[in-house]
């Protein structure tokens, strides 16, 4: 009966979403077309002096990967102004990035979105870039009201609001790594493929915050173990953590547990129980976690944002992902770790389409075997 009501609610929500999007598109899918001067280089041919990136989803991992675009544009065109719409913890990832000139904080409140758009419109951006696979009504409104000279989006050839479009299955493939999609955007702008570096950037100003903490670690190697994913179903349980910790207790590897908010409280018993477990008591933002990862050797995580941070610093990674590539069958490819040494382990599938996966249902024996391979790879 519970699954029946879930099914009915999902059908209703999908129906209403489709209606809202149609109405929103009818209202906001409008733009006076700007003449595009065609050639081999959109930026130069159309005198692009400023670019606004829209990253209003608040996803940390996406922002990390997006950093390659900021850097590569600035590398060729250092005088171009790069603005960025962002929200939440994703702002922390780019707040010290020298390739971003201005950050605009996004709030979901409709009134604040309009105020933000009017502020941006005064800046008269030449080009707006949106990465959304599905545009919600508030996002359509934001793009419309920003008033950029050109708008570039994803699969938007049938939209009046967009002047340019990166096309899936033509400019990139859905099953390719996310960096290939961002490469397609850069090529659309006229950058040369052979000159583009697809690595990520994270800039950390305070490099000494954990010096004392790290100096107390007696083991010769350090492994960052991140328990947390996007939901409780995608987070490691205490039992899972203990299994990994116990397996590593005689391997001369320190385990650094990372967390957010008040999650420290549910982990501190592990530090008291195991001599190879260390928990810093002052993780206040994602850059703190990034610093700990940078100063470690290995990373194990069920969360893609941590995986992307580890990839930035080319750390050896074991990631635990849902089976079958997630909802669309390609997540494990699109969001794969990007270090020299990586391994993705899959948990078991959910029992029905209305249940949640449990990330803890991976095979422990497989995890142990992969940990040994990862450790040996670093010797």
Residue ranges and their predicted role:
Residues 1-379:
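Catalytic machinery of carbohydrate-active enzymes
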